[in-house]
Each structure stands twice: as structure tokens, then as C-alpha cells.
Amino acid sequence: MAPVPTHLRRIAAAAAVVALLDTANAAPYASPHGGHGVSLAAAEDLPRRIISLVPATTEMLFAMGAGDRIAGVSNYDRFPPETARLPKVGGLLDPDVERLLSLKPDLVIVYDTQADLKRQLERAQVPMFPYAHRGLADITETMRALGVRVGAKTAADAAAARVEQQLAAIGRRVAGRPRPKTLLVFGRELGALRRVTASGGYGFLHDVLELAGGADVLGDLRKQSVDMSAEMILARAPEVIIELHYGDAVKPENFDAERRVWDALPSVPAVRNKRVHLLDGSEFVVPGPRIVLAAERFARTLHPEVGRK
């Protein structure tokens, strides 16, 4: 089979992020230490072989000390490094049901939109934890609910509280500063201003941008993703453009070339004032404990005068 062109891989990656967003409407990751708080379920009923089809919940399980009970993960899990050795069972759009069932799970974390998979798991009498993500606050809410479900309530509550405290600290550092109008782009055809997809005024990306001291230039549109034309970008006149990259579609040495693509719109304030920023990292598209790192990087990009604390 011929290799897939890079620009098509980029489009596919952006489509996957849009699919993730559509499932709902300061420090890097650190695993907690200590024991597990047992939920109301009896200890013998707690899941011992968990399969997570959601990278965010995989990271949550590790954060609450339940990573040793994960029996399988999605093809898209990359963090923490321990996921590399775990069996892969497909993803949001292409779950491998046969492979999944062969691992004999006693709990499967699924996207709530995976209706066909949920029906098959129901027929197989496999317990499920449906996942639907919306805004920033849902990250810690999901962590706490998942902790109860797997019998790690105490550790999950502690991990969630740390995330909330770290996010609040970032918010305090940028409070009272001017909030630049920001366009947050998470999809674009490489080498051209085509197929531009940006964060609208709803969802965790919007929430993190606002917490980090930016004013979402599409904040009035209650959508998680917005397809942008050049005319729309010109009309919105963002003062800052942040473009997210993830995976291997763009090498760091090519960032300058991709940044120059925006020179096609010289009248846009962000372009004119050289405030187009390309950021790379899965923490921007995996709404789990590392969302703190995403918020930190947004804050330093939007407000470089504010040091990391």
C-alpha cells in the first residue's frame, strides 16, 4: 500500500479531534502515591481488568493509582509511557470488539456515542462506564466518578483536587491582565490556509483558553468546533493565533514554514504583530490530568510576561 501523504494524515488527525469534541457537546502529569479509597461497592466486585477506549480516562486511572488494573487501551493512547506495553483495542471510530472481548474485561470505558459497541457489550454482559466530555469542569467530575466506580475514591478525589488547585493558580496569575482576542486552531491542511478548524465558545479547549487569560474570538458561537474561511478570520481579526499540533504530522523543524502560511493574511492583527504561535503536544487534545500543562502553556503564550510559578 502506498504511504498516506502527510497532509492527509493531518486532516485525519484533525477529524479525530473533531470526533472527540463531538462526543459531548502546573506541572506535567504526576502519579499520586498512597492507597486506594474503596467505594461503596464491595471489594470483590471492583473491576480488575479495565479496558479504556478513551485516552483521557486512561490517564485518569494512572493518576489515581489504578493503572495496574488496565488490561487494554485505545490505539491512540501514548501517555503515560506504561501504555506502550498494553494491548490495543482500536478507538472511537474503529473499536476492535473481538480483540476487546478476548481480553476478558470486567469494565470497559466507552465513548457515550459508541452506540453499536455499547449494544455488543450489553449482549456480552460486560459492564461499562460511558464517557462524555463537555467543559473543563467535567474533567475533575469524571475523575471523581471514575474513582468511585473502580474503588479508588480517595486517590481520585486527591488527584482531582490537585488539578483544580493548579488550574486556579494559573487563573490567578493572569487575572486582571488584558485578554487578547485569540483564535485557537486545532486543524488545518498543511502548507495552506484550507480546512481550518478552530475552537468555538463551548468545550474544554475554550474553557482552558479563557482560564489562561485569552478571549476566545469565537466565544459567541456555542460550538466546540468551527470551520473557518479566510473571510471569517479576517472579520474576527484575532490578536493572537494559537495553532495546535499533535502526533507526527509536523516536525518541529517545519514549524517556521507552517507559521509563515499565515502571512497570506497580513492584515490580521496576530499576523501583523507576529503573534502566531504553533504549540505541539497531546495534552491539548486529551482532557485528562495533563490539562494543567495545556493551561500553563496557553498562559505563557498569551502572557509571556507572567513567569511560571
What are these regions (language model features)?
Residues 35-37, 89-98, 221-230:
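Short helix-initiation/N-cap motifs at beta->coil->alpha
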Residues 44-49, 116-193, 218-220, 271-309:
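Extracytoplasmic substrate-binding proteins
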Residues 48-103, 107-117, 217, 265:
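A short, structured surface patch at a secondary-structure boundary
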Residues 2-13:
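Bacterial N-terminal signal peptides that target proteins for export
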Residues 24-30, 41-43:
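Boundary at the C-terminal end of the N-terminal hydrophobic targeting segment
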Residues 12-23:
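Bacterial N-terminal signal peptides
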Residues 199-225, 243-245:
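His/Asp/Glu-enriched short active-site or ligand-binding loop at hydrolase and phosphoryl-transfer sites
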Residues 97-104, 124, 228-237:
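Short helices/loops that flank or line small-molecule/ion binding pockets
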